[in-house]
Design a protein with these regions (language model features):
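ABC transporter nucleotide-binding domains
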Residues: 1-63, 67-70, 76
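Short, surface-exposed beta-strand/loop "edge" segments at domain boundaries and coil↔beta transitions
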Residues: 24-25, 29, 102-106, 128-134, ...
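Short N-terminal micro-motifs specific to bacterial/archaeal maturation
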Residues: 32, 80, 94, 136-139
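Generic structural signal for individual residues within well-ordered alpha-helical segments
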Residues: 39, 90, 146-149
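ABC transporter nucleotide-binding domain
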Residues: 42-56, 60-125
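C-terminal coupling/interaction segments
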Residues: 113-158
């Protein structure tokens, strides 16, 4: 009998869990799954890590990473180019949208990456609150993993 993509993913996960391993290495475990199957698989992973086990996930689906991972690593061309706790990333990091004039006059002490764009600069900061408090005219967005990955990959490290 033919299994759906979701059923195959669940079957693969059950097979992996049946070995009693304390570490699972999963490559794109939710790729190609519909929302329901993906959420079910993520729930299985969450249950697994509550038993003092670990999972290393390689994924391009950033929403899955935000909801399940403790640490986020970005690997580009075989090199770790970014690492931080996912909670820190979501709570403290942010994206600054700066005109050329704003960029020239802003304190860059907390800027980690910059990306030149049509209106000026996108900047990744690891201290969003610093810019909210000290630069009220600057657009400061709470970041998401997608925006971080984009600027880390395409931008320049400061």
């Amino acid at each position: 009998k033919e299994f759906s993509t979701g059923m195959r993913a669940r079957l693969n996960m059950i097979a992996a869990l049946s070995h009693g391993a304390r570490l699972l290495i999963l490559d794109e475990p939710t790729s190609g799954l519909d929302v329901i199957a993906r959420n079910e698989l993520l729930d299985i992973i969450r249950e697994y890590v509550q038993d003092d086990c670990s999972v290393l996930i390689s994924s391009h689906i950033s929403g899955d990473l935000e909801g399940i991972c403790d640490d986020l690593y970005m690997i580009h061309d075989g090199e770790i180019v970014f690492h931080d706790d996912t909670d820190v990333l979501l709570d403290e990091y942010g994206m600054l949208k700066l005109t050329n004039e704003q960029y020239a006059g802003i304190d860059k002490i907390n800027i980690r990456y910059i990306l030149k764009c049509d209106y000026g600069y996108d900047c990744l900061t690891d201290n969003r609150q610093f810019y909210v408090d000290n630069y009220p005219d600057v657009v400061v967005e709470k970041g998401c993993i997608d925006s971080f990955l984009n600027i880390v990959e395409k931008g320049e490290r400061v």
